[in-house]
Amino acid sequence: MTPLRLSMSAFGPYASLVEIDFSRFDSSLFLIAGPTGAGKTTIFDAMSFALFGETTSDVREAGSLRSDFATEETKSFVEFSFLLRGKEYRVRRSVPYEYVNRNGKLSRKAPEASLEIEGKTVSSSLTEVNDKIQKDLGLDSSQFRMTMMIAQGRFMDLVQAKTKDRLEIF
């Protein structure tokens, strides 16, 4: 999988739309580095949320991903485009959140997902998008987390993993 573009709107610390164009880099291998609090994990959370509807941590839940700084009108979503086996995929997910509706009552914005391959919509069903992504990537969310990033303090988990577990990942 080669990342192409990542768009985050009202996601994590970002109140409005933030876009990262990975295609402008010459390499298909990336190192995302920076000081603590710089937003590295947010990038991986956005990728993981787009692909699997889950974050990279067992601590953060999808419902907590909407930015506290976003206006009520700003839609919360993540869109991730990537190349896989020569085909361009684009997956988009909305972040579930609560808001005050026109009647002044608390409502919940349900999560949504859509998947396009080569510009053609393949699915707009959460379950179908999840199944297709997992099937095509050959990874579930846990395996994705282990191969895409090593979270702070979790390096030893990878080093100490049993050979069988490592073989499943790689």
PLM regions and their residue ranges:
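Extreme N-terminal "head/tail" segments of very large remodeling/mechanoenzyme assemblies
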Residues: 1-131, 135, 141-143
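Conserved beta-strand/loop subsegment of P-loop NTPase cores
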Residues: 147-148
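Short, small/polar-rich loop/turn modules that mediate ligand/substrate recognition or access, typified
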Residues: 151
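Nucleotide phosphate-binding site architecture
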Residues: 156
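Cytochrome P450
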Residues: 159-163
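Catalytic phosphate/metal-binding cores of nucleic-acid and nucleotide-processing enzymes, i.e., regions
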Residues: 169
